Amino acid sequence: ARPCAAQWVRTSGGGPGVVRASQGGSGAQARSVQEGAPADVVTLGLAYDIDMLAAVGLLPANWQGLLPHNSTPFTSTIVFLVRKGNPKGIHDWPDLVRDGVQVITPNPKTSGGARWNYLAAWGWALRQPGATPDTARAYLRSLFAHVPVLDTGARGATNSFVQRGTGDVLLAWEDEALMAARDIGPDQFDMVVPPLTILAEPPVAVVERNAKAHGTLDLARAYLDFLFTDAGQRIGAKHYFRPVTPSILAENRATFADTATFDIASLGGWTQVQKTHFADGGVFDGIYAR
């Protein structure tokens, strides 16, 4: 968000002199806004968190239809970050449950990013020949049996893998994996894109109640509109997010590997997914009873 905000300020022709930003986990940020943090816009990891803000009247219930592409200016995918040279030969989801493979992923009860990881695995399992919800549960149960430590958030999981050297593979957003493999540790890590994964759609929205109170509604809308311009799309691509504008994505085809994806709607949408999988007594609780 910060690079986009900086460029927007420079090019907005008399716009605000400063954009204040707060960064953190999607759910924690949503709760902060719900409890009174004066955000004019939110850019979060999953639509469910913005739905929670709509549920208390901070923005319209139809917020996702107010901007293009379901209010998602960039997308990502869930990929595998492995040790340099991929010594465990991890290429696809079945490889994660082989003997001797340790998988690092956070707790999907506490981490929005971990929910994308979990749902990528669940959706893959459901799409296998002869698959049923029971076979998908069995795969997820086996997968989490290979997780040696369940961090509460994505940053903690990344630290476990990158800094503490725990595990053989980190389930991560593509942008984070590309940053690690190209910028942070090109001699330490490789990125593997599985043949089938989930389309992660991190949405944006104007918090209309706050923006109206601050007199910044037009500015807030203009900033989010900027994210969908060619300039905004190129900034996203520079930071390893997949642009939604086809021509800008084509400019960056060398960065982003081809892969088949499925979206959250194909799994029932966030409200249903949250209730089925991550609520107390849901599927995750059933497979991770330790």
Segments (PLM) and residue ranges:
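Extracellular/periplasmic juxtamembrane helices and adjacent flexible linkers that interface
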Residues: 211-290
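Short secondary-structure boundary segments
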Residues: 46, 107, 174-175, 239
